[in-house]
Amino acid sequence: MEAEVDKLELMFQKAESDLDYIQYRLEYEIKTNHPDSASEKNPVTLLKELSAIKSRYQTLYARFKPVAVEQKETKSRICATVNKTMNVIQKLQKQTDLELSPLTKEEKTAAEQFKSHMPDL
């Protein structure tokens, strides 16, 4: 889950960087090649639209950031709870001299999938 969050964060950063570059290139192209082109869409309008798109990306990123933080905190709490539960089970097994039967194939698969999503365990 953390890898996905980091990947999304990098995607937003790259998108913002790409938009900055596009805006710079458009401004440069307009200044050098199309000083007074009347037949095409107004370059100033295009730049305003680009600025609006960039603003929407920044707003989306600002909304995304707290979600990413909450996901990391939730993951940490889940891992801590699972670790505590595992410790309690192990203590109970020792106190009662109880041995559990080996895991079934499905249980092993589920445990592996869980560990792959929660490497902190």
UniProtKB/Swiss-Prot annotation:
UniProt keyword annotation of Cytoplasm present: yes
Cellular component per GO, a single term: SKA complex
GO biological process: attachment of mitotic spindle microtubules to kinetochore; cell division; establishment of meiotic spindle orientation; mitotic metaphase chromosome alignment; mitotic sister chromatid segregation; regulation of microtubule polymerization or depolymerization; spindle assembly involved in female meiosis
InterPro entries noted in UniProt: Ska2, Ska2_N
Intrachain disulfide bonds: none
Pfam families: SKA2 (PF16740)
UniProt GO MF annotations: microtubule binding
Cell location: Cytoplasm, Cytoskeleton, Spindle; Chromosome, Centromere, Kinetochore; Cytoplasm, Cytoskeleton, Microtubule organizing center, Centrosome
Record-listed Phosphoserine modification sites: 101
Domain of life where this protein originates: Eukaryota
Protein's UniProt keywords contain Membrane: no
Annotated keywords: Cell cycle, Cell division, Centromere, Chromosome, Cytoplasm, Cytoskeleton, Kinetochore, Microtubule, Mitosis, Phosphoprotein
Described function: Component of the SKA complex, a microtubule plus end-binding complex of the outer kinetochore that stabilizes spindle microtubule-kinetochore attachments, promotes alignment of chromosomes at the mitotic spindle equator (chromosome congression) and assists suppression of the spindle assembly checkpoint. Kinetochores, consisting of a centromere-associated inner segment and a microtubule-contacting outer segment, play a crucial role in chromosome segregation by mediating the physical connection between centromeric DNA and spindle microtubules.
Subunit structure: Component of the SKA complex, composed of SKA1, SKA2 and SKA3. The SKA complex is a homodimer organized around a central W-shaped coiled-coil structure, formed by the interacting domains of SKA1, SKA2, and SKA3, each end of the 'W' is extended further by the C-terminal microtubule-binding domains of SKA1 and SKA3; the complex forms extended structures on microtubules. May interact with NR3C1; the relevance of such interaction remains unclear in vivo. Interacts with the MIS12 complex subunit DSN1.
Protein family membership: Belongs to the SKA2 family.
Protein name as annotated: SKA complex subunit 2
Provenance organism: Macaca fascicularis
